[in-house]
Curated annotation (Swiss-Prot):
Natural source organism: Acinetobacter baumannii (strain SDF)
Function according to Swiss-Prot or TrEMBL: Transport of potassium into the cell. Likely operates as a K(+):H(+) symporter.
Keyword Cell wall biogenesis/degradation listed: no
Cellular component terms (Gene Ontology): plasma membrane
Protein name in the entry: Probable potassium transport system protein Kup
Length: 625
């Protein structure tokens, strides 16, 4: 994907990145400062308090986004790709950690990924609600319609997902640029009237606020975290745009405009403390209120689209790495490989978002649910990056600790602050995260047990090939057996002999191997092995972001083996495993039932590997775990 970024000019790529990478963090001014003061119950809106909270916001943006993500985390790339799954795969490949201890690192990666799924539910709900709530500033007439309008926008957004964002996507960058410039202009207009607000850049205001209000600071931090939501996106989308355009957009457009807008809202509060009701929209001149509401709604839809696309992409990576069951994945663009649509996840997200809006009703209520997911994800990133720096960059442990501990302490404080809101909404991301982690861990463990059972109970392939001789009837044609255990005889082959009493002239065992890299070079795609006159073994290697097309890869394999390739003379034999519970070591009964249920509902192998259905023969088998 980085090739696309390289072909385009740097400013054009930075503009495109604005619409995808910064949509989430760009909509934070709609609610972040308001929630920071709401969190500080009873704290007067005096100048020292306004400047103190603004200073905390500014330095959180600088420390967490500018230094941690932009300067450090974005250097921890997996062959150009970013995101928590890519970082986990990179660490599993590079870190010299005992297998029995890798489970802890996998758990951290799973927790971070699971919370991102939660983010995909909470972000559209809070963003769209906060934008539409601007209508209540214009007139009370709209008050009863805020929720229905927000739900209608969300439903429309999810209905068009199957068509992909390609058509409207080209407008995302320019619209988001106008949005950020609007934020900056509104801020400048207010700051000029009350320039004393620029004192927020001095850290002494933050230190003074923390010193005089230590308990209140803890509550305020739980809302200040809303200003850094979307920081993960800078890293997660790095593979699409490259680090340079993202850094360019951040330092030259996003950061200045965000800081100016927060300063402008603070200046407004210094002039009129009553504006705390909704400092963002009260910053807007009356004549520009409706255009700004429309612009804010467009910005939140773009932010939501970016998060939804991120969830689809993360799910695809998890599926290909073997952490999630196969789901149906549709490609919505012929030219852009990364534009995908996952129907099951699409409708699941839509239902969950509507339920959230109906339960919480306002963006202020949802803010409690939002912060905890963000802070925990950031903490997971910090831990995994520390492992990466130690193992890949070969830094000494003291040096790593000196770099990482300040971020770890800051984010631990943010986690603690947002944890205070568990009862008022923080339970939402925890519940979503717990469900997602359970699914990820159960599927991974279930697959391990299944493959171990197959390896243990099935005949060795080498022994089978040596002993088969001329005891079976050979029929013309090629039989391709898809198998995850290349060293044993596939169940489908055994069933073919048992029921049909035949073997094909050419029996080809194909195993798909997913590497811990985003993409595998075409020349490294295939390894082939001739086992005997009638038997061949092929391994096809893909990265976790590669397009998987087995028939296409087989053309290359046949060429290496010196065989004639004709898809219409190839039969693909696939074993449809039926998993059943057995007494003994393994998983707890409820996890086995969950795994069996997921196994039954996986997308067909033929769809996943793009094998024509008219060339597929499915044979059932039963495996006890």
């Amino acid at each position: 994907m980085q090739n696309t970024a390289k072909k385009a000019t740097l400013p054009a790529t930075a503009l495109a990145a604005l619409g995808v990478v910064f949509g989430d963090i760009g909509t934070s001014p709609l609610y972040a400062l308001k929630e920071s003061f709401h969190a500080a119950h009873g704290l007067g809106i005096q100048p020292e308090n306004v400047l103190g909270i603004l200073s905390i916001i500014f330095w959180c943006l600088m420390l967490i986004i500018s230094i941690k993500y932009v300067a450090i985390v974005m250097r921890a790339d997996n062959n150009g790709e970013g995101g928590i799954m890519a970082l986990l795969a990179l660490n599993l490949r590079k870190a010299k950690i005992a297998d029995n201890k890798k489970i802890y690192m996998i758990a951290i990666g799973f927790i971070g990924a699971s919370l991102f799924f939660g983010d995909g539910i909470i972000t559209p709900a809070i963003s769209v609600l906060s934008a539409v709530e601007g209508l209540s500033i214009a007139t009370d007439v709209f008050d009863p319609f805020i929720m229905p309008i927000a739900i209608a926008i969300i439903v429309t957004l999810f209905l068009v997902q199957k068509h992909g964002p390609a058509f409207v996507g080209k407008f995302f960058g320019p619209i988001t640029l106008v949005w950020f410039l609007s934020l900056g202009i509104l801020g400048i207009h207010s700051v000029i009237q009350t320039p004393v607000v620029l004192g927020m850049f001095s850290p002494h205001w933050a230190i003074q606020f923390i010193y005089h209000h230590p308990i209140m600071t803890f509550f305020v931090m739980g809302a200040v975290v809303l200003t850094v939501t979307g920081g993960e996106a800078l890293y997660a989308d790095m593979g699409h745009f490259g680090p340079v355009p993202i850094r360019l957009a951040w330092f030259f457009v996003v950061l200045p405009c965000l800081v100016l807008n927060y300063a402008g809202q603070g200046a407004l509060l210094l002039r009129d403390p009553a504006a705390i009701e909704n400092p963002f929209y009260l910053l807007v001149p009356q004549w520009a209120l409706y255009p700004m509401i429309i612009m804010a709604t467009m910005a939140t839809v773009i932010a939501s689209q970016a998060v939804i696309s991120g969830v689809f992409s993360l799910a695809r990576q998890a599926i290909q790495l073997g952490y999630l069951p196969r789901l149906s994945i549709k490609h919505t663009s012929e030219s852009e490989e990364g534009q995908i649509y996952v129907p099951f996840l699409n409708w699941l997200l839509l239902i969950a978002i509507i339920i959230l809006i109906l339960i919480f009703k306002t963006s202020s209520n949802l803010a409690s649910a939002y912060g905890l997911a963000v802070t925990l994800t950031m903490l997971c990133d910090t831990i995994l990056v520390a492992v990466f720096i130690y193992s890949a960059w070969k830094w000494s442990l003291p040096k790593v600790l000196i770099l990482i501990i300040p971020f770890f302490i800051l984010e631990s404080v943010l986690v603690g602050a947002t944890s205070l809101k568990i009862l008022s909404g923080g339970w939402v991301p925890l519940l979503i995260g717990a469900i997602a982690v359970t699914i990820l861990m159960t599927w991974k463990r279930g697959r391990e047990l299944t493959f171990a059972k197959l390896e243990h109970d099935t005949l060795s392939l080498d022994l089978f090939v040596k002993s088969i001789g001329n005891s079976v009837h050979w029929v013309p044609g090629d039989a391709v057996f898809m198998t995850g255990t290349p060293n044993v005889v596939p169940h489908a082959m055994l069933h073919n002999i048992k029921h049909n009493k035949v073997l094909h002239q050419r029996n080809i065992l194909v195993t798909v191997v997913i590497e811990d890299v985003p993409f595998v070079a075409p020349e490294e795609r295939i390894t082939t092995e001739t086992l005997a006159e009638h038997f061949f073994r092929i391994k096809i290697f893909y990265g976790f972001k590669d397009e998987m097309n087995v028939p296409k890869a087989l053309m290359q394999a046949y060429e290496q083996l010196g065989l004639e390739y004709d898809l219409m003379h190839i039969s693909f034999f696939i074993s449809r495993d039926r998993i059943v519970h057995s007494v003994g070591d393994g998983m707890s009964p409820w996890r086995e039932k969950l795994f069996i249920s997921m196994q039954r509902n996986t997308s067909p192998v033929s769809d996943f590997y793009q094998i024509p259905t008219n060339r597929v023969v499915e044979l059932g088998s039963q495996i006890e775990i």
